[in-house]
Structures are given as C-alpha cells and as structure tokens.
A protein has these predicted regions:
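Bacterial N-terminal signal peptides that target proteins for export
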Residues: 1-10
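N-terminal signal peptide c-region/cleavage motif recognized by signal peptidases
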Residues: 17-18
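N-terminal edge beta-strand
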Residues: 23-51
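Active-site/binding-pocket entry motifs
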Residues: 34, 62, 73-75
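Beta-strand cores of secreted/periplasmic/IMS beta-sandwich domains, seen most often
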Residues: 43-69, 108-120
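Extracellular/periplasmic metallocenter environments
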Residues: 61-62, 100-141
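Short edge-strand/loop segments of extracellular domains
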Residues: 71-77, 139-141
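Extracytoplasmic beta-sandwich strand-turn segments characteristic of Greek-key/jelly-roll folds
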Residues: 74-114
C-alpha cells in the first residue's frame, strides 16, 4: 500500500522527468554552403513565455554555423549589418545567448527564459545573415 509520502515522491519524480512540463523546445536547423542559399528554420515560430530550449542542428556538410538569439525592440526592427565585415553589429543588441561554432553535422543547445515579444535567431558568421540565415520567433503570454 502506498503511503502519502510515497505518492508525493512518485509525483515529484514524474514531474521532474516530464520534459513537456519544463518549458518549450524549439528545433532549429541551419543549412547552406558557401555560394548557395543559406537558411535557418524552426519547427515552430510561436511559443509561450517561459523557459525555452533551442535544439540547434547544423545540416551543412562543409560550413560552420552559429545561432545567436536577441529580443527585438519591435516586430519590424531590422538589424544593422556592418558592410565591411558582412556581420550584424552585435554591440547594438542584447544577446540572450548563442550556440557558437557548430561544425558541420553538429548539434548544440541554448536555454533561455523568454518574455512576450519578438525575437530573432540568426547566424552571424561572415555573410551568413546577409545570405538569409535568420528567422523570427514570437513569444506570447
């Protein structure tokens, strides 16, 4: 016969082991090689506020990629690209973290606590943002 204590322990273990109760998960795939189109895609573009884990996969065969996460001031905000460097000027942004230096075929993850608003995910390796490696994520209440 289960005691109240045993039931409480079992419930606590179940809750701790259930990923769905731990927040949202967004799967991100980065792909593209030099001279070809480059993409950053997500399996969902809207998540509720709270803890979010980004599972990032570099699907390229020869190119290294990264993923930077920033909160935009408004949904229509554009990021400033330093033309001479072919990179987004990260000094003007508040990064919430990044998955850096993903080798071809590699995986990485980023955990962040998100508040409602619009976010951008992008690769800031030289020329990759300009080649299309960016996507927006909407976080709801």
């Amino acid at each position: 016969m289960l005691t109240i204590r045993d039931t409480a322990i079992a419930l606590a273990l179940f809750v701790a082991a259930t990923p769905a109760l731990a927040g949202s998960m967004v799967k991100v795939v980065e792909s593209g090689e030099a001279g070809e189109p480059m993409t950053l895609t997500m399996d969902q573009t809207t998540v509720p506020a709270g803890d979010t884990t980004f599972m990032v996969h570099n699907d390229a065969t020869t190119e290294e990629h990264e993923m930077v996460l920033v909160k935009l001031k408004s949904p229509d905000q554009t990021l400033t690209v330093v033309k001479a460097k072919h990179r987004v000027d990260e000094k003007t942004l508040k990064s919430l973290g990044e998955v850096a230096d993903l080798k071809p075929g590699a995986d990485g993850q980023l955990k962040a606590k998100l508040v409602p608003g619009t976010y951008m995910l992008f690769c800031n390796i030289k020329g990759h943002y300009e080649a299309g490696m960016h996507a927006t994520l909407t976080v709801t209440k």
